[in-house]
Amino acid sequence: MRLLWEEEAWEDYCLWQTRDKKLLKRINTLLKDIQRNTYEGTGKPEPLKGDLSGWWSRRIDVTHRIVYKEQDGNIIIASCFGHYSDT
């Protein structure tokens, strides 16, 4: 599956490249796992509710989450900084 980034999510990802290489590595590992197993695997995948119904999150660390959804064979990344309530 191909990764498609919302603009803010891509900016967050680029920020991680200069801010924290360890968390960037974790994000890259999670992204690969999402492409292989969209709804299972590392990072404790969980479906989101309410306004974010249809989206999923995975834990980068205690504070940060990747928020994504599968659509038309692609993975759309909405956020990779902060918590999904910040999205």
Task: Describe each PLM feature range.
Residues 6:
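Residue-level signal for threonine
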